[in-house]
């Protein structure tokens, strides 16, 4: 078995794309293939790509069909689907190492579906399963058709530049369910270790590991540390060679360290989308009613979306303003081209007609870029329209304002929110109350009873709250939310919400068509609100571990376990005098939360990292990325 060597690019997404491109070129370096005279004439080799569900999720999150074609993939199919023979081309199998998958591969080869097979397992195949694979190939006389078997270490999904998911559902439920037996917990811990090991291989450097003691995070940390030690001892792969870059810190945390970000009503673009629309693996589903029929539109986000790249983490009113500005810029650029070419619209522009005019040809050459820009802006206009409708229907601006000043609310304000028939869904109200309940020091029993009665009377079921009541004291002890707040994106007051006004003015007809009225009323409720970025608990923990000397939270993380896969033993900072030298600063961190992650936390960490001087890099991920509704459902299942 072998690990495909990779360089260390500027982001996890770029690193994973490099690894996938190498996989698509039969585990040969793409740059070498393109530059070598010996191979250039035959590049790319045409081939078939076969994947399972996990492989499909990994690829589709970072590559498009055009990217697959660029690397010679003419056909891509699921391994469980019916497939016709394509006997004269090789097949790449990108699948999980399971009994079912190896049997399906052997079945394909026995039928002669493809010329040869390049088998790329997304994670490490066990020795027992590998031996069984070899035995099946021998029995069916297909061994000669298997040209490669690789452990690719790609069993995770990248959603943003430095944002990943291990795609392991229900981890929170498993770790907090009293009926989960030891075998199940150990199995899930091993799944997490396998996924994190793959992320580390892709990044090409061995981290120093920190985690709280006596937790599920420690179980993962210990097993991952041993896995890395064994790998360092037994292999000489490129990713463990001398690396001039400083080693990162890997911070492992349990979800119970802070439950609030999972259910917050956020005001940032990407978090609002994840909360109010169906967003899975960078595909957004927008439902609308056209001619009395419910229709669905799908929008795919990718790394080439310039608007998403620069606006995803911004407050939604600022995003609305930026849509307006970008559309104005597009119209000005389009008008310039039509003016120079003497036509009334871009559709009338004939590129061939200007072949002899360098001046006009230069202007017309911008046409493809303009068309792509317009498609992206139209997509975000439609998404913004759907968000505005959700904000109006659920009064999300009210919840955002209440939660922004959650500890300042009194009993009457809380009951008023719960009892307001026009404000939010029952789940919105329960989320709001749980956030308040986790934010205050104590709640009198009589008050709690009154709140619960009000919640039930307004359609709420209390299963999620019952679970939170059990873990409240643990969560309260670990919450380190900083009292320091900073203006979000440098915008304040009316200036921030000017985007709503311009959007309302410019696209009134579009909103009316979508059934959205009274946009000004939505704006007026938040016009005087100054959104501040508060360093959440996990951001405070990360700061204390990356830069111990500058964080007031450092004392609360001193007891965290410190594991160095390159060292012989584990130590904690506060119980070993020699560990004092380990209080080093880090420029890069990998942060993984066990039991669910979210876009709000990712954005908060990214904002903090950008503000540092010099800037820091943080890669954030989780066992699974959950919307507030999904996490509420998981908590309810534990009541």
Curated annotation (Swiss-Prot):
Alphabetical GO biological process terms: endoplasmic reticulum to Golgi vesicle-mediated transport; intracellular protein transport; retrograde vesicle-mediated transport, Golgi to endoplasmic reticulum; vesicle docking involved in exocytosis
Annotated signal sequence range: none
Keyword Cytoplasm: yes
InterPro entries, per the entry: Sec-1-like_dom1 (IPR043154), Sec-1-like_dom3a (IPR043127), Sec1-like (IPR001619), Sec1-like_dom2 (IPR027482), Sec1-like_sf (IPR036045)
Predominant cellular place of this UniProt entry's protein: cytoplasm
GO molecular function, one term: syntaxin binding
Keywords: Cytoplasm
Xref: Pfam families: Sec1
GO CC annotation: cytosol; Golgi membrane
Localization, UniProt: Cytoplasm
Family: Belongs to the STXBP/unc-18/SEC1 family.
Protein name: Protein sly1
Organism per entry: Schizosaccharomyces pombe (strain 972 / ATCC 24843)
